[in-house]
Amino acid sequence: MTRDTGASEPVGTLHAIVLDVNDLESCVGFWTEVLGKETSFKADKYCRIGGDDDPPSLLLQKVPEQHEHKNRAHIDLDVKDLEVAVQRAVGLGGTKLDEISEYGITWAVMADPDGNEFCLVRHS
């Protein structure tokens, strides 16, 4: 079996990133401020932040299960000033978990109010 690594038609395009959350309201408030985007759809168990004109959007999905383990995937956000971005995210309800510098890149590992991990990244 061989794998074609050349350019071809994609299976699909990235439309949304979905995060499972327990507290939908606090996460909506946090992520709309962090991303600087408004909600484009909201229902009992879902809220979409951003729209079709600026993909990918972030879809928050309310689930009953608690966040107990490290995320297998996470969001990276590029920032101009890491310290300012960390302070702002913490002020909005986030938590700083770690700060790492490797290969000329520094990033802060963060968690949203529901424990979902993401990184604020400054490229040197």
Where are these regions (language model features)?
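Conserved short beta-strand elements that form part of the metal-binding/catalytic scaffold
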Residues: K37-N71, P113, E117-H123
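Vicinal oxygen chelate
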Residues: D23-L24, I75-D114
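N-terminal beta-strand motif that seeds the catalytic metal site of vicinal oxygen chelate
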Residues: M1-G29, P55, A73-I75, V121-S124
